[in-house]
Amino acid sequence: MSGPIVIFDSGIGGLSIFDEIKKVLPDQGYCYLFDNARLPYGELEESVLIKGCVDLICEQVKRIDAVLVVVACNSASTLVLPGLRARLSIPIVGVVPAIKPAAQISKTRHIGLLATHGTIKRSYTRELIKEFAGDCKVDLFGSSELVMLAEAKLAGEKLDLIKLESQLKPIQHSDLDTLVLGCTHFPIIADEIQQVLGAGVKLLDSGKAIAQRVSYLLENIEDKLDNSAGELMAIYTTEEITPGLATRLAEKGFTTIASRSSANLD
């Protein structure tokens, strides 16, 4: 029998993907695995990121007999999917920046991508733009500071609007009409981003599309639920997390919240 879905990210950004998946699969079991010891991923060397992510995810999949993996991190998805698929026989779902739908809905043919520096510089991102937004002007905006602002918000801290406005200033000076949130952390602060940029800029992310893909894949997996169905566990890679973050995870229904080093999940 198979166990829960593993949703993986460097930090709490993947919770935006978890929320969308849980809406369509409310009774499924989930393991939210976040590598906060190495946050933010957008600043890591590619070789370090690949090996660390693949080893960590494979270890957790085998430990809990997971049925499917969602790599809920744009920076990681651009690099680690081949390595995971080579080692695991279960479905692996990555997150792709919503370039295609942004190009489809833009009225001015001018869109933007807001992501980590790692995602911005990858050739995979350029190929997406070339394939799906070749007739658009595409502005690229890199920020790791926004990742940390989202982390702080979900941990219960007050969002630093001055820092947020500073990070978004280049976008304010652009005349784009559609902005892709190309990091799963960014939907967590989407309301604040919208407030700064104004109603004239449409924000897009990949959450709903990922949820639909996961639902489709699970329909083709027999015995996808077992006695652990509905159980929610959150595993992190630091020794501890802040009380504020632990509270937020509990509010989302996670009953097991533990460090990877101390979690006894066998």
Curated annotation (Swiss-Prot):
One of its GO terms (molecular function) is glutamate racemase activity. The active site is at 73 (proton donor/acceptor), 183 (proton donor/acceptor). The keyword Isomerase applies. Keywords: Cell shape, Cell wall biogenesis/degradation, Isomerase, Peptidoglycan synthesis. It catalyses: L-glutamate = D-glutamate. Transmembrane segments: none annotated. Substrate binds at residues 9-10, 41-42, 74-75, 184-185. Coiled coil: none annotated. GO terms for biological process: cell wall organization; peptidoglycan biosynthetic process; regulation of cell shape. The keyword Cell wall biogenesis/degradation applies. It comes from the Bacteria. Its EC number is 5.1.1.3. Pfam families: Asp_Glu_race. Pathway: Cell wall biogenesis; peptidoglycan biosynthesis. InterPro entries: Asp/Glu/hydantoin_racemase (IPR015942), Asp/Glu_race (IPR001920), Asp/Glu_racemase_AS_1 (IPR018187), Asp/Glu_racemase_AS_2 (IPR033134), Glu_race (IPR004391). Belongs to the aspartate/glutamate racemases family. Provides the (R)-glutamate required for cell wall biosynthesis. This is Glutamate racemase. It comes from Shewanella halifaxensis (strain HAW-EB4). The gene is murI.
